[in-house]
Regions:
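Cofactor-binding active-site loop characterized by glycine-rich and histidine/acidic residues
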Residues: 9, 20-23, 35-128
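N-terminal hydrophobic or amphipathic helices/low-complexity stretches enriched
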Residues: 1-16
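N-terminal capping segment at the start of a domain
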Residues: 13-29
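A broad, low-specificity signal for short, low-complexity segments enriched in glycine/proline
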Residues: 2-4, 28-29, 88-91
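Histidine-centered catalytic micro-motifs
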Residues: 32
Length: 129
């Protein structure tokens, strides 16, 4: 990987971490440790590896991602927002009763989420069928 690409990925991951911390702080609820620990992996997947199109999030030929530790939604939601699936401003609705950014990833309300998860360990079994 060229140096400029790596630098850009690091900057994106740092921005996503800041957004995740703000989300958890503003909601006074969430799982910051688990969310921050996977940010580099999510950044590389969504910005360098996976074939996804924010303009066509249900493309049948897209790569799919299952966030098995669904309680770490403060990691996935900022990545999806920065990738263009929805506006960054939507993150302000995290864990609000009138919003769609739940504490566990939710596929029915958030474009780019391929599976609703929450119970630890359910994601891997569902992902492989």
């Amino acid at each position: 990987m060229e140096k400029t690409k790596l630098t850009q990925l690091k900057l994106t991951a740092a921005k996503a971490r800041l957004l995740a911390v703000e989300m958890v702080h503003d909601a006074a609820s969430g799982h910051p440790g688990g969310s921050l620990s996977c940010m580099d992996v999510l950044t590389d997947l969504y910005f360098s590896q996976m074939r996804v199109d924010p303009k066509n999030p249900h493309d049948p030929d897209r790569d799919r991602f299952v966030m098995s530790k669904g309680h770490c939604s403060p990691a996935l939601y900022p990545i999806l927002a920065l990738r263009g699936f929805f506006p960054v401003e939507n993150l302000k609705m995290f864990r609000r009763i009138d919003g769609h950014m739940s504490g566990h990833v939710e596929m029915h309300y958030n474009p780019g989420v391929d599976m609703s998860t929450g119970s630890l360990g359910q994601g891997i079994s569902a992902a492989v069928g």
